[in-house]
C-alpha cells in the first residue's frame, strides 16, 4: 500500500458538493447550466484544505446561506463533520450584483451582438468573476486553503446562493 504524505492532492480536495436547496433562488437556464458546470469542474479538479485538517480528506462541501451568512459545512467523505465556517456576505454584495448585471448583458448579447461586442462583455464578466474569486480566497484565508481555480468555481456557486439569501 502506497502512503501519501499529509497535504497531498488525493486528500486535500472536494469529492462532492451540495447546495442548500432552501438557499437557492429561482434562476434561468443559463445560471442553472453554469451552476452544473461549476460543480462538475470543481469536483473534477480542486485544491481544498481546511486549516488543521491536512490529510483528513477528501472532503464533501455543503454550501448554503444561514442567518445572512455564507455557510461552508465541510465534512470528511464518510460524513464526519470537520468544520463549519460562516462568512459575511457583505464583501460579495457589490461584486455579485455587478456580476449578474454583466451576465444579463452577456446572455442578451450572444443572441444579437457582434462577436467583438460579445468578446468585450465577456472580458468584463471574467474580470468581475476574478474579483469575486480573489475576495473569496481572502475571506477563506486562515480557514481553508484553496487555489485560484477552485476559488473561481466556488464563487460561481456562491452567486447562485447569494440572491435568495438576500431576502431572508
UniProtKB/Swiss-Prot annotation:
Signal peptide: none
Pfam families registered for this protein in UniProt: UPF0262 (PF06793)
Matches recorded under InterPro entries: UCP032146
Domain of life of the source: Bacteria
Disulphide bridges: none
Family of this protein: Belongs to the UPF0262 family.
HAMAP family, A to Z: UPF0262
Protein name as it appears in the record: UPF0262 protein BRADO6636
Native organism: Bradyrhizobium sp. (strain ORS 278)
Amino acid at each position: 500500500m502506497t502512503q501519501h504524505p499529509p497535504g497531498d492532492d488525493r486528500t486535500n480536495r472536494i469529492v462532492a458538493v451540495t447546495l442548500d436547496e432552501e438557499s437557492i433562488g429561482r434562476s434561468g437556464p443559463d445560471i442553472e447550466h453554469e451552476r452544473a458546470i461549476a460543480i462538475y469542474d470543481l469536483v473534477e479538479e480542486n485544491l481544498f484544505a481546511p486549516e488543521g485538517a491536512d490529510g483528513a480528506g477528501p472532503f464533501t462541501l455543503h454550501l448554503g446561506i444561514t442567518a445572512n451568512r455564507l455557510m461552508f459545512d465541510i465534512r470528511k467523505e464518510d460524513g464526519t463533520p470537520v468544520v463549519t465556517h460562516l462568512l459575511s456576505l457583505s464583501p460579495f454584495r457589490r461584486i455579485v450584483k455587478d456580476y449578474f448585471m454583466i451576465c444579463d448583458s452577456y446572455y442578451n448579447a450572444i443572441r444579437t451582438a457582434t462577436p467583438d461586442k460579445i468578446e468585450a462583455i465577456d472580458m468584463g464578466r471574467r474580470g468581475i468573476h476574478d474579483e469575486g474569486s480573489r475576495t473569496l480566497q481572502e475571506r477563506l484565508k486562515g480557514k481553508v486553503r484553496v487555489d485560484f481555480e477552485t476559488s473561481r468555481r466556488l464563487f460561481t456557486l456562491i452567486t447562485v446562493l447569494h440572491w435568495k439569501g438576500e431576502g431572508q
